[in-house]
């Protein structure tokens, strides 16, 4: 870190609390986006795991949006002076249901900020802890640890990491076509302005990727949706995922799963069979 850069470590411990009410319309909209038939969403319906991402949307003023479509650096998240930002992974504990109609408070805390040098230059990792409490409860219904990675700009001589072959032996699998409409709908549902998901000229010419990038949270949601399709009565108590390499809109990709007792291995692979996301869910016994 240079003398002119902010002390990013000073952001550790900062917190904010925001409030939302769990409405039915976002649930119905994501149900349609994931290609399920329309169903009533009555008050009291439990949210499927990860669908809390439809709420607590980032309501930044248009004048506060940066060139990449995210909010300008600073504020709650530290002002990391690196241009590329990606969702690296998350861990979850699902302790109690969150239901349609609930009033929910989300307290977010900067848990850690770490910097290191990688193959492609400097990396900064920011870990955020989210706790969601329903209807003024003392204990959280959901705890999430969210890992964000910031990277330097793409260089012409960057060498991509060696790909990792995806596992075989899937008991469940589903092919996903990540077209522009799917990516747009998910961006709209989560009020995500990040241009890498919908602006092809920006993502290819400015950030140097070959195509639009499929949202990491969308892939994670599709993994747990695969579990729900094949084990609809299963109750997920914990989940973790790690983004291994980007998934682009240029080809279909596949989500896979296999169950071993109360542990479910879930993973996504690209059209060449390379692993793009690895995840594990734990089921209530």
Which residues does each PLM region occupy?
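Residue-level preference for alpha-helix termini and adjacent loops
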Residues: 10, 17, 21, 52-55, ...
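Catalytic-pocket segment enriched in acidic/His residues
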Residues: 203-262, 268-280
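HotDog/MaoC-like acyl-thioester-processing domains
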Residues: 2-15, 87-178, 247-250, 254-285
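Alpha-helix boundary/capping detector
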Residues: 79, 130, 134, 212-213
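Hydrophobic, proline/glycine-rich low-complexity stretches
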Residues: 1-103
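A contiguous, surface-exposed recognition patch within enzymatic or periplasmic domains that forms
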Residues: 2-46, 163-219, 226-229
């Amino acid at each position: 870190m240079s003398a002119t850069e902010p002390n990013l470590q000073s952001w550790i411990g900062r917190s904010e609390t925001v409030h939302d009410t769990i409405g039915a319309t976002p649930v119905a909209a994501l149900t349609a986006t994931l290609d399920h038939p329309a169903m009533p969403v009555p008050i009291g319906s439990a949210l499927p795991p990860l669908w809390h991402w439809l709420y607590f949307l980032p309501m930044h003023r248009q004048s506060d949006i940066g060139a990449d479509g995210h909010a300008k650096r600073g504020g709650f998240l530290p002002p990391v002076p690196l241009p590329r930002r990606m969702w690296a992974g998350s861990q979850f504990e699902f302790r109690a249901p969150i239901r349609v109609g609930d009033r929910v408070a989300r307290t977010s805390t900067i848990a850690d900020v770490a910097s290191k040098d990688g193959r492609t230059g400097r990396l900064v990792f920011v870990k955020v802890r989210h706790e969601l409490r329903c209807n003024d409860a003392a204990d959280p219904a959901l705890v999430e640890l969210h890992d964000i990675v910031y990277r330097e700009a793409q260089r012409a001589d960057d060498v991509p990491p060696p790909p990792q072959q995806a596992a075989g032996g899937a008991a469940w699998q589903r092919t996903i076509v990540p077209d522009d409409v799917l990516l747009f709908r998910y961006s709209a549902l989560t009020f995500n302005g990040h241009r890498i998901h919908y602006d092809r000229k920006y993502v290819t010419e400015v950030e140097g990727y070959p195509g639009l990038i499929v949202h990491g949270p969308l892939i994670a949601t599709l993994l747990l949706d695969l579990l729900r399709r094949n084990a609809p009565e299963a109750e997920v108590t914990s989940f973790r995922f790690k983004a291994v390499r980007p998934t682009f809109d240029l080809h279909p990709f596949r989500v896979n799963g296999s169950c071993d007792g109360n542990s479910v291995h879930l993973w996504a692979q690209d059209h060449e069979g390379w692993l793009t996301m690895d995840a594990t869910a734990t089921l209530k016994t």
